[in-house]
């Protein structure tokens, strides 16, 4: 199906809320076709900036269940007023989380997943200017009608969090020995063993480091996913070679007051994963859900830095 390069969209059609729309093709088809099922696309990656971006999406069917197979396509639009101009188009691939592939994995009862996700749709996109943008995602599944959904998002001029290639903040984060009860710095039940290392101390000791910013019990995103569980499951595979630190998002969850380290790292969403090399430089960062394969590949690359 051929789409015109410029698509007129009303302000309602690309509102700040997620769209539930039919196909955005202009023109009248030669023969009547059934209206595609009403679906929803949710951005898993919460931060997008001018330049190259990793974009992750969750596509929900008419019953609110994640769509996890098929051939995907994404079109990115720059929005100006009530019009949207096509800027790029790319394939979107479904990537399973694949926790079961890790030896010794067992599902943790404390994990709070807002959606029963087994993975996410992944692509890359380059944005040339800040401001409002939109994405239209289509998924073609064998034996099913084409599904199409749109949403809008903002592109920032620059990230508020540490950039890849920049020094990581030398944070003096709270650790287990600083508090009377581990629940002061972890909402995980039971808590793991990512609370014994200060970020500043790991960097000073030239230890590679994974820093996870997430809140297992108070996930505020619909697609925050099992990030804590993913990192905790991977940790034993690399614990000899690097340190793992979990930072809760909220100091005061009821009033949404963030932890000091969250503020120091400039984070405005969750979850986030940062990989810091032995020189204290940020090598990878992930906004939103990250798959096991992506995370392990990034860890291996970080450990290889001398």
Question: Where are the model-predicted features located?
Answer:
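Short active-site neighborhood of thiol/selenol oxidoreductases, capturing the structured segment around
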Residues: 181-183, 191, 199-220
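Typically the conserved alpha-helix immediately C-terminal to a functionally engaged Cys/Sec
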Residues: 221-238
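Thiol-/selenol-based redox modules, centered on thioredoxin-like
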Residues: 159-162, 169, 175-180, 193, ...
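Bacterial N-terminal signal peptides that target proteins for export
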Residues: 2-12
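Thioredoxin-like thiol-disulfide oxidoreductase module
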Residues: 239, 245-270, 275-282, 292, ...
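Active-site-proximal beta-strand/loop segments in catalytic clefts of secreted hydrolases
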Residues: 213-216, 247-250, 287-289
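C-terminal motif of bacterial Sec signal peptides marking the signal peptidase cleavage site
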Residues: 19-22
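Contiguous segments within soluble domain cores/interaction surfaces
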Residues: 28-128, 132-185
